[in-house]
Amino acid sequence: MIELNPVRQRITDLTDRVLSLRGYLDYDAKKERLEEVTRELESPDVWNNAEYAQNLGRERSSLEKTVGGIASVLDGLADATELLELAESEQDEDTALAVVADLDKHQAHVEKLEFQRMFSGEMDNAAAFVDIQAGAGGTEAQDWAEILLRMYLRWCESRGWKTELMEVSGGDVAGIKSATLRVEGDYAYGWLKTETGVHRLVRKSPFDSDNRRHTSFTSVFVSPEIDDNIDITINPADLRTDVYRSSGAGGQHVNKTESAVRITHIPTNIVVACQTGRSQHQNRDNAMKMLAAKLYELEIQKRNAEKDAVEATKSDIGWGSQIRNYVLDQSRIKDLRTGIERSDTQKVLDGDLDEFVEASLKAGLAVGSKRVDA
């Protein structure tokens, strides 16, 4: 019979990790939101706005993975505890070994959930645009750009993401000069963002009749898709409303009734006022329209600032911003930021990028991160 105390301790440790995740991933709020979204999707009227319904469907899918994942692991760990007690009482080693095998699966699930903590950025769950630009070097560089495009397409396919080639400019002889790929899926931008930078290829060129070694560069830039559909929701609790007597033209209502309305939006300190209506109700309605317009403009300014920040990041990517070397004639691909190195080069170029991307995310890397020695 195997020793059971380490197995019990493992169940306890995994349970503690999941309970910690419940708080970090805001399980209770997500569960409540999942119930709301599910109820809304069950309404026959929701499909009157197909785009809105599709967005709700995507939100439900994302919420189900978190809420369902945590609940599933907790249920599994509870079952493991009961089975372990049964195995001990009956001295059944096969059952005990089955519990250990189940714990391996639960641990992998917990680690996957814990990895979601990497995606704390506001835009991490957005769709992503991947821009690929061949560097100087003619046909060799353009062929390298196409190889990278294929690599990302394969990687996205392996993750079940939806891809759309938005633009592609063919090379002079082979390959591509540039391409833009749109990627939609769970945390697409969060996963892809650390791929921004310059990718360096070293190989014996198939386009060189003398089979000489060539070095080529291609830049990759990843940006989030900014949702331009702005829904302004005003929480009544965020408003302070003052009423006062109108001044100026207004006939019999001037200085006789407090029909003028001033509304202060406390979070932004935006103040709007209206006194032209003939009733307080009318002035309040007009003031709320003015407030909604100002909040809309504020959101537009915020999103434009986000776009400007993304473009500023793009301009910072110089040809010295290398993030990964692909030295194919030595069967070596090395990430210059994390030190991760692989020798199965064809497998990587076929889209097996998880190890590189996960290491970058765990290191909290961003554009311009410090390189390790190549």
UniProtKB/Swiss-Prot annotation:
One of its GO terms (molecular function) is translation release factor activity, codon specific. Methylated by PrmC. Methylation increases the termination efficiency of RF2. It is found in: Cytoplasm. Pfam families: PCRF, RF-1. Its main location: cytoplasm. The modification N5-methylglutamine is found at Q252. SUPFAM superfamilies: Release factor. Keywords: Cytoplasm, Methylation, Protein biosynthesis. GO terms for cellular component: cytoplasm. InterPro entries: PCRF (IPR005139), Pep_chain_release_fac_I (IPR000352), Pep_chain_release_fac_I_sf (IPR045853), PrfB (IPR004374). Transmembrane segments: none annotated. Peptide chain release factor 2 directs the termination of translation in response to the peptide chain termination codons UGA and UAA. Belongs to the prokaryotic/mitochondrial release factor family. PANTHER family: CLASS I PEPTIDE CHAIN RELEASE FACTOR, PEPTIDE CHAIN RELEASE FACTOR 2. HAMAP family: Rel_fac_2. This is Peptide chain release factor 2. It comes from Stenotrophomonas maltophilia (strain R551-3). The lineage of its organism: Bacteria, Pseudomonadati, Pseudomonadota, Gammaproteobacteria, Lysobacterales.
